[in-house]
Curated annotation (Swiss-Prot):
It comes from Streptococcus mutans serotype c (strain ATCC 700610 / UA159). This is Isoprenyl transferase. One of its GO terms (molecular function) is ditrans,polycis-undecaprenyl-diphosphate synthase [(2E,6E)-farnesyl-diphosphate specific] activity. Mg(2+) binds at residues 25, 216. Its EC number is 2.5.1.-. It holds the Pfam family Prenyltransf. It comes from the Bacteria. Homodimer. Keywords: Magnesium, Metal-binding, Transferase. Substrate binds at residues 26-30, 38, 42, 70-72, 74, 76, 197, 203-205. GO terms for biological process: polyprenol biosynthetic process. Its cofactor is Mg(2+). One of its GO terms (cellular component) is cytosol. Catalyzes the condensation of isopentenyl diphosphate (IPP) with allylic pyrophosphates generating different type of terpenoids. The gene is uppS.
Amino acid sequence: MFTLRRKKQDIKLSKIPAHIGIIMDGNGRWAKKRMKPRVFGHKAGMDALQDVTIAASELGVKILTVYAFSTENWARPQEEVKFIMNLPVEFFDKYVPKLHKNNVRILVIGDKEELPAATLDALERARELTKHNSGLILNFALNYGGRAEIVDAVKLIAQDVLDARFNPGDITEGLIADYLMTSNLPYLYRDPDLIIRTSGELRLSNFLPWQAAYSELYFTDTLWPDFDKKALYLAIEEFNHRHRRFGGV
């Protein structure tokens, strides 16, 4: 049982989701409210990510998958995209050492072919540095699109059928899951138990559509840079009140 003190009553958590997905939304609006450029919000968002990752690790969460950059985000202003692509470099220098000290392991899913070399290098260094850590997995969805992930999986499966590796009748949900990008995660925890979206938007925006089939969804008006340990506890508290039926009664 984890307890966080608050003025009116304690937040008590008895059921901790093994895998949490977060759509980190609202950096630009957070900056605008402070009359700052959008990139100011992205920097503040990295502080929030570090704090939430450590808080989740302390709770015993096994995987935290964060939607860092979607395949649709390339349509944003070029200067903003350039800044976002440089964030992994800054993240490695400023935040990864502390996360490494907290036994966090870093992984990445998404289409890496379009990412700049410096971005890829920073991500690979973070992955390599933390690969032997046994704590929480911080899984970045970077240049990720859920529908494209499924299309790519179908193409690979079709090719393997043509190569006579298995028959169409052998295709199951489990086999398809093995062809998705999240196959790099521990088998029992590939699908998020809880998906959190900040900033008040009420949609998944192409985030893990296959894996989210039975995820509990939690939407909050809190902008991502303001999402902290208490906000995480409140989301998990709501998760504790849910009854997950998985299609049953």
